[in-house]
Amino acid sequence: MFDLQIPPDPVAEPPPVVVSAPAWDLTVGLISATVQLDQRNADAPTRRVGTGFLIDAPRPDGQPRTVLVTAHHVLDGMRGPEARIGWRYERPEGGWRFAPEPLQIRDPAGEPLWTRHPERDIAVMEVLAPPDFARAAIPLGWLADANALDAWQVGPGDELLTLGYPHGYSANTAGFPILRVGRVASWPLTPIEAFPTFLLDFPVFPGNSGGPVFWTPSARKAPGAFQPDHPFIAGVLTSEVRPGDAPLGIGIVAHAAYVREAIARLDAPAGP
């Protein structure tokens, strides 16, 4: 005679794990949409370098349009009719290829082909981008408007990220921009009519001008502080604080709302 073992209750299969698609990463998105701008100086074996980034800004009739954004002084300081824009192409076998191409920035009379914000160091111009870059252009809605920094409680000490080409250097031979981080160093930030720029605590070098300044969840805020519900572009790096010959290691950022205003001027009727 023997006892029968009672089999254990069947173990329920765990519910399938639902893996959601990763959220779109503005950091990688902006890296893909940021380009080097340069022009060789006519009187020296050097070149003038700046940074630009692409915005997807459809025309009023809905037709697609890719707009290059940079600091006005970057293009204004390039006296020749052509600059170079640093496109990058992914190789089918892997890796990337840096392939700068000419960018017409002045007409035959020497007049600028870009549109300048009337008061801020912001320039925009429509560009014919390669398909991969046109797809990488950042949607216009990701540019912070005049009320965004208040709504998202961005304040002094908060981290923001920026992309650029300091001294003309890139992150690698493929021409990708260098990612850096700084903290908001001024207060108040708004209203932007009274405070059109704000300070960022990080060293600025030639070649950084025109780069995007942005927030993503990877940037640190004070513990317990309000977290914005999605990433955004806060502004454009335009210059540095330099009271004399010695820089202070502090950047000056123009609010992204002025980029919106400059893009709107592309669609304004031509003057008489």
Predicted stretch roles:
Residues 40-67, 250:
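A conserved glycine-rich beta-strand in the N-terminal activation segment of trypsin-fold
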Residues 2-19, 241-272:
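C-terminal tail/extension regions appended to the core domain(s) of diverse proteins
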Residues 32-35, 39, 48-49, 78-197, ...:
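Serine endopeptidase catalytic core focused on the charge-relay Asp
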Residues 43, 172-176, 225-227:
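Short consensus segments that form the blades of beta-propeller domains
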Residues 199-236:
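Catalytic nucleophile loop of clan PA
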Residues 70:
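Cytochrome P450 catalytic-core helices
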Residues 54-56, 186-188, 215, 238:
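A residue-level detector for short acidic-glycine micro-motifs
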